């Protein structure tokens, strides 16, 4: 993927989107308008696949984002959902502690099938003022060597960050950049820029702290 394939085919990667129901996974993936327009439903496993294209300084890259269509509310997902995934996003809701508490379960299911793939952890709904999951408590990604981003699906805040990080990992090229923004749905809410800067500083400060004792093996 250091350059577009000579035969003109766009490098395409299967990305699985996991996390508790209600954390905003579908809202997030639907922000990308061409992906929403071109999505396909796979009835056998109850999944919507959204092809999300991004344009980089090395050509186009596409993520086939698998969204569960709400099945996770009825327990875990079938292995067929995870098989052949090349990267993943685990999402939780920063206004709901239980969704963060369940992140290790999603991670365990993912790595049991996919083993060593690049994974981004995303804390969604940072536009909501009553944030419950604070920066200092978000440590799981550090223990498991994942990338973490605060996001707000409804405002498009940090929408591209997880995809850029994954694209660089998959391409093996930290110099890869997105050169054009995808068409996104208009923001439904606005984020408070000062608050976002404060959250970012808190995350950076938290990263410098030693990890808490392993009272609980997963958290």
Swiss-Prot record:
Pfam families with a match to the protein in the record: Ras
A GO molecular-function annotation: GTP binding
Region (Switch-I): 39-47
Cellular component annotations (GO), alphabetically ordered: cytoplasm; cytosol; nucleus
Keyword Iron: no
Disulfide-linked positions: none
Modified residue annotations for N-acetylserine: 2
Protein family per UniProt: Belongs to the small GTPase superfamily. Ran family.
Protein name, UniProt field: GTP-binding nuclear protein GSP1/CNR1
Source organism of the structure: Saccharomyces cerevisiae (strain ATCC 204508 / S288c)
